[in-house]
Amino acid sequence: MANLGCWMLVLFVATWSDLGLCKKRPKPGGWNTGGSRYPGQGSPGGNRYPPQGGGGWGQPHGGGWGQPHGGGWGQPHGGGWGQPHGGGWGQGGGTHSQWNKPSKPKTNMKHMAGAAAAGAVVGGLGGYMLGSAMSRPIIHFGSDYEDRYYRENMHRYPNQVYYRPMDEYSNQNNFVHDCVNITIKQHTVTTTTKGENFTETDVKMMERVVEQMCITQYERESQAYYQRGSSMVLFSSPPVILLISFLIFLIVG
C-alpha cells in the first residue's frame, strides 16, 4: 500500500509540474506583441481575414462599415449588434443569448453513490433498509410437485429484502435471520391487504427464497464495507496525504 502511494505521488507530481509550467508560459497574440489579437489591424503578415466580394472598408456589398448586406454595425442581415438574422447580441443563434437562462441544478453524486450502496431507508420500520431488486433464485425442493409449484408461483414471492446495516450484527447468521423475518412479515402483510393469502407451502418456499436473497445481500454489504475500509486506509496513508496537500498547493497557487 505504501509503495502504491509513493508511485501515485511521483506520477501526480510529474504531471502537475508540467501543467504548472504550461500555465506560466506567455500566450501569443497578447497586447503589444507581434501577433495581433484583432485581425486586420496592423499585423505584420497582412490581414488574416480580407474583405470578400471586392468591397473595401466602408464600401457597400462587401462587409462595409455601417453598410447593409455585409455585417455592418447595427444593420440587419449580417450579424449586426443586437439585430436579427446574424447571431447578434441577445438574438437567436448567438452565444450570448444564453446569459439570462437559469443554470440547471447539479446532482450531488456523493449522495447518489451513498444511497445506491446502502439502500433506501424505509420509513416506519425502525432503520431497516430496502435492498435492490434481485432475480429470484432457482431452488429445488426435493419433489416434482414443489418444484413445479415454485416455478408457477415464484412471481408472488419477494424480490427485495429488508435489512439493517451489517455492522449492527455480530455474524452472518444473525443478519440473515433478522432479514428473513422482517422481509416475510412485510411481504405477507402487504399482500394480505390486497386480498391474497399464502398457504403453508407458500410460506415454506418464501423462507427458502428469502434466505438465499438475504445471504446475497449480506455478501454485497460485506464487499461494500470492505471497500469503504480500504479507501479510508488508502487516503489516510502519509504519501497520499502529502500528494493531496501538494495538489491543493498547485491549484491554489
From Swiss-Prot:
Cu(2+) 2 binds at H69, G70, G71. Keywords: Amyloid, Amyloidosis, Cell cycle, Cell membrane, Copper, Disease variant, Disulfide bond, Glycoprotein, Golgi apparatus, GPI-anchor, Growth arrest, Lipoprotein, Membrane, Metal-binding, Prion, Repeat, Signal, Zinc. Residues 23-38 are annotated as: Interaction with ADGRG6. Monomer and homodimer. Has a tendency to aggregate into amyloid fibrils containing a cross-beta spine, formed by a steric zipper of superposed beta-strands. Soluble oligomers may represent an intermediate stage on the path to fibril formation. Copper binding may promote oligomerization. Interacts with GRB2, APP, ERI3/PRNPIP and SYN1. Mislocalized cytosolically exposed PrP interacts with MGRN1; this interaction alters MGRN1 subcellular location and causes lysosomal enlargement. Interacts with KIAA1191. Interacts with ADGRG6. This is Major prion protein. The lineage of its organism: Eukaryota, Metazoa, Chordata, Craniata, Vertebrata. It holds the Pfam family Prion_octapep. It is found in: Cell membrane; Golgi apparatus. Its primary physiological function is unclear. May play a role in neuronal development and synaptic plasticity. May be required for neuronal myelin sheath maintenance. May promote myelin homeostasis through acting as an agonist for ADGRG6 receptor. May play a role in iron uptake and iron homeostasis. Soluble oligomers are toxic to cultured neuroblastoma cells and induce apoptosis (in vitro). Association with GPC1 (via its heparan sulfate chains) targets PRNP to lipid rafts. Also provides Cu(2+) or Zn(2+) for the ascorbate-mediated GPC1 deaminase degradation of its heparan sulfate side chains. Cu(2+) 1 binds at H61, G62, G63. Changing T188K: In early-onset dementia and dementia due to prion diseases. Residues 26-108 are annotated as: Disordered. Cu(2+) 3 binds at H77, G78, G79. Disulfide bonds join C179-C214.
